[in-house]
Amino acid sequence: VVILGWIFMCKWLGLVFFLSFYSIVLTLSAATLICVFFVQHNYENTYAKNTKNWDLIDGAILGSSNLDIPNWLNWFLADISFHSIHHICERIPNYNLRACHKANIHLLQQSKFLKLSDFSNCFKYIIWDNKNEKLIPIS
């Protein structure tokens, strides 16, 4: 069905225009989702430990952020903004993440919530300090 849609769009809009437009949309979508993934794991005071000191529950709750974003944006991200509960049990389908998060909020009180305004600060945390077992900012 998807390939038939591409063929139809190529005939309707022209091959070069369709592929140019499609490539731009695909690239911007991928870049946005990579940024969201990065922000949900790299932020100030995120839980990060060496393998021998890793704790599964702390890693799930303290090592991933939840996003405090508008509902319309959350719809585009398929509720992955409720990320800590996803790390506790990755088998929860996206359409149940919000309900599971709310039902287990008492377990997630220490989890980090980030706003859109916090995103730019997260991109500084890319260096691993092995001695102190934490991410440190580049500036």
Where are these regions (language model features)?
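Non-catalytic, topology-defining segments of multipass membrane proteins
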Residues: 1-24, 95-139
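Histidine-centered catalytic micro-motifs
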Residues: 36-45, 76-92
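Glycine-rich loops and low-complexity Gly/Arg-rich segments
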Residues: 61-64, 86, 108-110
